[in-house]
Regions:
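Acidic, carboxylate-rich catalytic segments that either coordinate divalent cations
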Residues: 166-201
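Solvent-exposed functional surfaces
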Residues: 1-169, 174
């Protein structure tokens, strides 16, 4: 039986001499490992891994979150610093601290099936929300992310209600699936709503 992908990616941080296509995944796997196991992390014990089966967040979705930022976002801009890894961890830790404050009832104690916030589609789309707040506002702090996410909150339907994706696309809170199409739609919706709110300030 082949090794499960999630286990391969979990082992990547300990493997050297990898081909280029694996290196961004290796970096993401390391960041996620640290966030999952550092006691003061806002994601401590939250990510489901072979070494942490009690976690509920998708390891793959969280790696995608990091990779989006590393490929063309905040983390990419940190690469010029010697402590870029520490900056990357701090950024994501601060963002998810804010997520847990602003969306407390949609996060605490819930599984992905009960909250799209903790679902693969929600997590990956949130990476673009973080990037928008960073690129538009220079946000890296917990307080800055809390302020930005509060603007977005009225437009979300993580656990109940409907997503008003467009005039012709309205779907129940759990009608968003973990597919590239739905992730793209949710990302576009969240970032457009946030841009509108930021302009009003």
């Amino acid at each position: 039986r082949p090794l499960p992908k999630s286990l391969i990616y979990e082992l990547l941080p300990t493997v050297d001499g990898l081909p280029e296509r694996f290196t961004s995944r290796k970096f993401a796997a390391r960041i996620i490992d640290l966030l999952n196991f550092l006691p003061n992390s806002s994601l401590f014990g939250e990510i489901k891994q072979h070494t942490n089966p009690r976690g509920v967040l998708s390891d793959m979705a969280m790696q995608k979150f990091v990779m989006n930022s590393a490929n063309d976002g905040a983390i990419r801009s940190f690469m010029k610093f010697d402590d870029f890894e520490g900056r990357s961890i701090e950024l994501i830790n601060n963002f998810f601290h804010a997520v847990r404050v602003v969306f407390k009832s949609e996060w605490e104690g819930l599984a992905p099936r009960n909250s799209r916030l903790k679902h693969g589609a929600g997590l990956v789309s949130l990476s673009f929300v973080m990037e928008l707040l960073y690129s538009d506002q220079g946000t890296t702090s917990k307080e800055g992310f809390i302020k930005g996410l509060k603007l977005l909150k009225p437009h979300t339907a993580w656990t109940s209600g409907d997503w008003h994706i467009s005039e012709t696309d309205r779907r129940p809170w759990n009608g968003i699936q973990n597919t590239p199409t739905d992730i793209g739609l949710l990302t576009k919706y969240l970032t457009e709503k946030l841009k509108q709110e930021l302009k009003r300030r």
